[in-house]
Amino acid sequence: MRIFYLLSILPFIGGFTIHSSVSPQPSTFTPLNIYNGTPGGRLNRDLRATLPINELKGNPPSEGCPILNLHRCKNPSMYDKNDNIQMLSNPIQKTRGFLKLIRYKNILPTLLLTTTGGFLQTQSITQLLKSTSFLASSMITVCIMASSMILNDLFDIHVDKINNANRPLVTGEVHPQEAVTYAALLLLFAECLTRYLPQQMQMVANWAIVNIVLYTPLLKRIPLVKNISCATIVAFSLYFAGKSATSSVATSPLLYVAAHTVFFGSLHNELLLDIRDIEGDVKNHIRTVPGLFGKTVAWSLAAIGMVYNVVKISTALSVQYSPAPFVLAMSPIFYHLYQIRRQHYSSAVIKKAVDFTNVPLLLSLLYFCKISIS
């Protein structure tokens, strides 16, 4: 049953590879068309003879090159087998490309989120490590996170050529068909792992899979909805792991507090990243809050969200705990928001602020864990 469920959503992914063998090949850069020929990546024999020659290795190719990050072949009739083809088939190169594609640096923060959720619910690391359902939920969360990154890059190749030109699908380190295969395998593995979850959490996992499949082609095109959807998935990973760690129906109040904090932290980051990427989004007709209403409106929403979160959580904590450590941990975020406005929404300042946001969030989660066992 789970396999049929997964197959029902794969057409959204497989749409990248569906094409007609008799229809003319497109000339634009699309997920199907990095090589301007067949999706399998092999160049047309007629096309090979027309490729321009660039003797300088390492230079980015000029417009019209079917491979985006490799230097031109010395012989216009074929690729240098010792250079380009070897790079394409090199397992180490492919592994690096895959790790970049899934944004592997997010794996550790993701596991920290799931561990925090599990600990807030059980107050025991030992119990977590012995819980098959918790371990399965953590693996499912990582797989969903990784596959969402792949799907995002597949749909946004045009945008990444402007905003993130070093992404592996843009540089050619990973071919779109390979990316589709990676995403499908990750989702299949995640779906198989749901059998180890409590019954109610299995439906939650299925909902998350559907959400990330629909996110980039549908939800991401709706201003603010896409920001809320992304923040919800991130925050819900913590709640999902916590509820999977135990069969208890009761939910720790601190689990709600932590999920609330992570949600607004993620929403803050999403809005700031939209400000940073406004140029590419506007050129590619992607509707975002800063693109439609201006950078100031997007910045204001991010700031208001963080103020609301700090006030709401501080009020909730003050009933039984001291909110001072939480407020202190979150305060640097407001300093960075001030710097973003002061520096006229500089991309470098925004990147620094987004990267730093993880520190206050981590400190807040550690504080929640501490008071959960006090």
Summary of predicted features, one role per range:
Residues M1-Y35, A49:
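N-terminal chloroplast transit peptides
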Residues H19, F29-P31, Y35-S374:
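Multi-pass alpha-helical membrane architecture of UbiA-family
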